[in-house]
């Protein structure tokens, strides 16, 4: 099970966070700071897996963003890397070569895509095609609602 997902920049700025375990806000901030510092201090040629407290951290850098997941010790690290890669593929499909600015200015869409893909720390939808279709359907529904709300009533 994934306990949380963090996306942060090379400068250490948190861009997205999703927690699947309940923790107090103060503890979340401390954990986030600690993980960002730990990951950023590692060399580029080191392993993408870190034993951290009672969890394992699995991270991958894409362009200027780090995608980091905390998983249980018995979970498969390579499968988690594939989950991260699939999330990046979904973001790429939606935004067209996603970058940090896409996450910053469209964070609600990034969260929506993540929620369409992972629920409760477990993978929800393995099919990229099905996930993209659900995202496109949601966009179409939102556009239809906006058009409907903008029509004058007589």
UniProtKB/Swiss-Prot annotation:
InterPro entries: AP1_sigma, AP_complex_ssu, AP_mu_sigma_su, Clathrin_sm-chain_CS, Longin-like_dom_sf. Pfam families: Clat_adaptor_s. Gene3D superfamilies: 3.30.450.60. GO terms for cellular component: AP-1 adaptor complex; clathrin-coated pit; early endosome; lysosomal membrane; trans-Golgi network membrane. It comes from the Eukaryota. Keywords: Coated pit, Cytoplasmic vesicle, Golgi apparatus, Membrane, Protein transport, Transport. Subunit of clathrin-associated adaptor protein complex 1 that plays a role in protein sorting in the late-Golgi/trans-Golgi network (TGN) and/or endosomes. The AP complexes mediate both the recruitment of clathrin to membranes and the recognition of sorting signals within the cytosolic tails of transmembrane cargo molecules. Involved in TLR3 trafficking. Adaptor protein complex 1 (AP-1) is a heterotetramer composed of two large adaptins (gamma-type subunit AP1G1 and beta-type subunit AP1B1), a medium adaptin (mu-type subunit AP1M1 or AP1M2) and a small adaptin (sigma-type subunit AP1S1 or AP1S2 or AP1S3). This is AP-1 complex subunit sigma-3.
């Amino acid at each position: 099970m994934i306990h949380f997902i963090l996306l942060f920049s090379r400068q250490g700025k948190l861009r997205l966070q999703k927690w699947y375990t309940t923790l107090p806000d103060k503890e979340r901030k401390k954990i986030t700071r600690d993980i960002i510092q730990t990951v950023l201090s590692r060399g580029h040629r080191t392993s993408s897996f870190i034993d951290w407290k009672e969890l394992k951290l699995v991270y991958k850098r894409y362009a200027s963003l780090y995608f980091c997941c905390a998983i249980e010790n018995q979970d498969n690290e390579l499968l988690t890397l594939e989950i991260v890669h699939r999330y990046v593929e979904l973001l790429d499909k939606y935004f067209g070569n996603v970058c940090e600015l896409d996450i910053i200015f469209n964070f609600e869409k990034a969260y929506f895509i993540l929620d369409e893909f992972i629920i409760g720390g477990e993978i929800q939808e393995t099919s990229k095609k099905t996930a993209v279709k659900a995202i496109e359907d949601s966009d179409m529904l939102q556009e239809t609602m906006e058009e409907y709300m903008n029509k004058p009533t007589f």
